């Protein structure tokens, strides 16, 4: 596994990796595998059906282990479609850290479309973190279009955190989660756009089983002339509980649309949605400025706290 300074910076940004990961990992770089390691309980293998990507199989009862599967692109002009499938056994408790970083110093677009599908066994808990980051001084675009599909069996839970740090010119995120009996999905989405960037998020959580629970927490900041559109949808098909909360800060000449939807197909479904868009309150800025912060520092402090 050979790493340049650019590689190291991208891996630290998107996966908090410094040096070789501990445990199971697969590092994808510029369409190829730059390093892979399995463990006794987590097996990572390349696709055998002609598609690009990997299969991750986690044994029943695996607890306290991490699996890192970051993707980095360091060359302009790369366009890739990757399929990663996760088969998680019963009674597991694992952390999966993904993410994609694009460094583009050229004139051609670089694009990563990643399709992740999770099959989570009974009474297993998965924490899944996915961060996106882009940099480089080229004129070519940095484009990411992730798709995540999750199937939760009885009593299974997933805690999903998706973060777009900065530097992604265009993204369309699609998320679908199906919850069985007593299953729970908690999705936290954090996003910042600036310049003329465009971000769209289409999310659907289907609460199919009795006792299923779903929660969506979306927080975003739009600066410059950037554009954000959110479509979170919670469907209650049994005795279940679902909550959607979308909060956004709009600045400059940006545009934000937040269109939450709740759909009940059972008289026993309890569903709530909340959405708010606003600017930074002037009294918040003034308070921090009286403590010695410049207007720019005060603004940055508020935004960090909001997205934390």
PLM segments and residue spans:
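Sequence-level preference for short, compositionally simple segments enriched
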Residues: 1, 287, 296-297
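Conserved beta-strand/loop scaffold segments within soluble protein domains that form the structured core
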Residues: 24-29, 33-286, 290-293, 303-308
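C-terminal functional modules
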Residues: 1-27, 31
């Amino acid at each position: 596994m050979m790493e340049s300074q650019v590689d190291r910076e991208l891996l630290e940004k998107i996966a908090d990796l410094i040096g070789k990961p501990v445990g199971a990992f697969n590092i994808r770089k510029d369409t190829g595998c730059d390093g892979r390691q399995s463990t006794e309980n987590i097996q990572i293998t390349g696709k055998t059906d002609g598609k690009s990507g990997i299969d991750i199989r986690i044994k029943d009862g695996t607890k306290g282990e991490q699996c890192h599967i970051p993707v980095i692109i360091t060359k302009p002009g790369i366009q890739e479609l990757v399929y990663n499938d996760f088969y998680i056994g019963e009674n597991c408790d694992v952390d999966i850290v993904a993410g994609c970083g694009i460094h583009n110093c050229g004139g051609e677009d670089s694009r990563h479309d990643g399709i992740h599908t999770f099959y989570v066994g009974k009474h297993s808990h998965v924490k899944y973190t996915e961060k996106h980051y882009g940099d480089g001084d080229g004129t070519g675009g940095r484009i990411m279009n992730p798709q995540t599909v999750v199937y939760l069996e009885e009593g299974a839970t997933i805690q999903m955190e998706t973060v777009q740090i900065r530097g992604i010119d265009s993204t369309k995120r699609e998320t679908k989660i199906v919850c069985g009996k007593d299953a729970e999905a908690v999705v936290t989405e954090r996003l910042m756009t600036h310049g003329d960037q465009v971000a769209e998020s289409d999310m659907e959580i289907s609460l199919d089983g009795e006792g299923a629970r779903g929660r969506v927490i979306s927080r975003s900041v739009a600066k410059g002339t950037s554009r954000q559109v959110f479509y979170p949808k919670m469907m209650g098909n049994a005795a279940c509980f679902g909550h959607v909360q979308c909060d956004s800060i709009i600045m400059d000449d940006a545009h934000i649309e937040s269109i939450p939807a709740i759909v009940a197909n059972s008289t026993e479904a309890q569903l709530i949605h909340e959405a708010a868009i606003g600017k930074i309150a002037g009294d918040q800025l003034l308070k921090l400025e009286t403590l010695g912060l410049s207007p720019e520092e005060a603004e940055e402090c508020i935004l960090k706290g909001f997205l934390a």
